[in-house]
Amino acid sequence: MKIILAVSLLVVSALGAKAQTLVQSFDDIQFWTGSGANRSALVLQWNDAGTPTSMAWGYRWSGNATGIGMLKAVAGATTVTQPGDPTTVLETSIGSDSRMTLTIERYGFGDSLFSISFNDGIQSRTRADWESGYWEYRLFGGNFDYMEWGDPLALTYNVPGSSLYSSVNWFSSPIGASDRELVDGSWDAFSFAPGFATSAVVQPFAVSVPEPSVAILITIVLVFFMLRRRANA
C-alpha cells in the first residue's frame, strides 16, 4: 500500500512540474494536429495580462490549406453564426484541442473570427471581437497579391516559410484567414487588440498536450499492483 501511495504522489508531482517551452522552432511545438508533409504554426496572443501572453500549436497538412482551416482544425469546437446573431448557427465542427472553443461570423466576403476561449482547468481565457477590441491577423510566409487602400496597383507578398522563429518577420495581413493559403513553414498569429490598440506579437510558448487525468493514472497504478500481487500469490 505504501508503494501505491508513493507512486501516486509521484504521478501528481510529475503532472504539476511540467515546464513551459519557449518556441524557438517547429521542433519545440508540442501540440500538433493534422497530417501531411507540410507544417505550419498557429499563434494566439491574448494580451490579457495572463501568462503566457502568446501560445503556439502546430498543424500538418498536404494539398491546399488556409489560415481559417488551420484554426478550425486546432479548436476543439467551432461554431459559425450569422453576424450579430449567435442563435443562427450555420455550421459546427470539431477539432483536436478540446480546451479551445471558437466562434466565427460568416459575412458575404468570408469568415471573420469573433471569439476564442481556452480553458485548461487551471485558467480560463476568453477574447471576443468587436466588443472590447478585435483580433488582429498577422502572418509570415506565403505568396499572394493584395491591394492597399487608395493604391490602384496590386502588391505582392512573397516570402518563403521557415521553421525557425528567429526568421519570422510578422506581417499585418491584408487578406482574411479564409483567403490566406498556407505554405510549408508558414506562421499565422491572431493577436487580440484590447481597446483597439495593436501590439507586437511576442515569441510564443508551446501549448502542452493535455495530460491524462490524475484519476486515470492512479487507477492504472492500482491495477498494475493488484495484478502483480495476484501473480505473486
Language-model regions, residue ranges each:
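Sec-dependent N-terminal signal peptides
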Residues: I4-S13, I218-L222
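Amphipathic, positively biased hydrophobic alpha-helical segments used for protein targeting
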Residues: L9-V11, F196, M226
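Sec/Tat signal peptide C-region and signal peptidase I cleavage site
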Residues: L15-A19
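Ubiquitin-like/PB1-type beta-grasp interaction modules and other compact soluble beta-rich domains
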Residues: Q20-S208
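A short, hydrophobic C-terminal helix/tail in secreted or cell-surface proteins
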Residues: P210-L227
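Short, charged juxtamembrane terminal tails flanking transmembrane helices
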Residues: R230-A233
